[in-house]
Amino acid sequence: MKMDADSSGTQHRDSRGSRSRSRREREYHGRSSERDSRKKEHKIPYFADEVREQDRLRRLRQRAHQSTRRTRSRSRSQSSIRESRHRRHRQRSRSRNRSRSRSSERKRRQRSRSRSSERRRRQRSPHRYNPPPKIINYYVQVPPQDFYGMSGMQQSFGYQRLPRPPPFPPAPYRYRQRPPFIGVPRFGYRNAGRPPY
């Protein structure tokens, strides 16, 4: 692209050919009448601050383009028609099935299942329902006479208690004697060598 002093790059700015306009260009140049009509109807802004409101609208407009839905959206009326038709068909087939013998019905079901499984496999959503693993508690029995005396639970008649209460737990090894060296007391409230009064 040749650039002289006077040629601004506007003529041929897009290196990919003018096929793709930027979103901003599209917003400002395309469908002006539509935009004006949209501006005319007055909506109460979410933010009182103008700049924030503009920003919010722009973000909303951007988000409207990215959609994560893979299936084509269908109109409500269509889906309801289809559903009612489906229901009617099911009822009709059910009433017909009652008269038939069970075995032929079973055969037919197996045949149809084998045929339709390929079709169904693709339609199932990729995120299947995975329940969290169930935690099962098993209660282990402890012979109660051992258990009651030790844990200090309430003693009921009929359970033997231990002949004498368990001895005091031994002192930890380090302080069986006086600790070997006590540093200089820092004269704080807790550490002072004498009580604080």
Curated annotation (Swiss-Prot):
Residues 1-136, 158-197 are annotated as: Disordered. Induction: Transformer protein is only present in females due to sex-specific alternative mRNA splicing of tra pre-mRNA. Female-specific alternative splicing of tra pre-mRNA is controlled by Sxl, which binds tightly to a characteristic uridine-rich polypyrimidine tract at the non-sex specific 3' splice site in one of the tra introns, preventing the general splicing factor U2AF from binding to this site and forcing it to bind to the female-specific 3' splice site. As consequence, only the female-specific transcripts are translated, while non-sex-specific RNA expressed in males is not translated. GO terms for cellular component: nuclear speck. It is found in: Nucleus speckle. Residues 1-17, 24-39 have a biased composition (Basic and acidic residues). Residues 163-172 have a biased composition (Pro residues). InterPro entries: Tra. Keywords: Differentiation, Nucleus, Sexual differentiation. The keyword Ubl conjugation does not apply. GO terms for molecular function: pre-mRNA binding. GO terms for biological process: cell differentiation; epithelium regeneration; female sex determination; female sex differentiation; mRNA splicing, via spliceosome; regulation of stem cell division. The keyword Nucleus applies. Its main location: nucleus. Residues 58-75, 84-127 have a biased composition (Basic residues). Member of the regulatory pathway controlling female somatic sexual differentiation, regulated by Sxl. Activates dsx female-specific splicing by promoting the formation of a splicing enhancer complex which consists of tra, tra2 and sr proteins. Together with tra-2, plays a role in switching fru splicing from the male-specific pattern to the female-specific pattern through activation of the female-specific fru 5'-splice site. No known function in males. RS domain directs localization of proteins to the speckled subnuclear compartment and the purpose of this localization is to allow colocalization and co-concentration of components of the splicing and splicing regulatory machinery to permit relatively high rates and/or efficiencies of reaction and interaction. This is Female-specific protein transformer. The gene is tra.
